[in-house]
């Protein structure tokens, strides 16, 4: 789960911006009512419902119902050239560890935001809040 409450608040704010109504968090995710999360969300905590749940159980249920489950990985398929569904669930990884092997096994499609850096010594990865914004923007652009 997301460890930094500020990142969770940013994700809630971005979700609100893109019209996402529900966020599902694993039990080890930062607390939505942490003051840092509340501040970073800029009020989005009152518009985006946050559910703390057992993610593997939830993902299994959603997959059985036919809902696509996307995961974000450094080695996934390029989000700009991959076919995307108009509905589904997007799993964002933990800041330090990414998505766990257990959750990875439940994702139907692995996505990545490609780097356009000029050299190999550039930034290794994106902040999870920034990555969430880019991912949601691309999904919404294609709708």
For each predicted feature, which ranges?
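Short glycine-rich loop/turn motifs that provide flexible caps or phosphate-binding loops at active sites
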Residues: 8, 42-43, 70, 92, ...
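Short flexible/disordered coil segments
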Residues: 66, 87-94, 132-142
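Structured adenosyl-cofactor binding patch, chiefly the S-adenosyl-L-methionine
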Residues: 17, 32-43, 101-143
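Active-site/ligand-binding-proximal alpha/beta "capping" segment
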Residues: 70-123
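Short, flexible micro-motifs
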Residues: 4, 12, 46, 74, ...
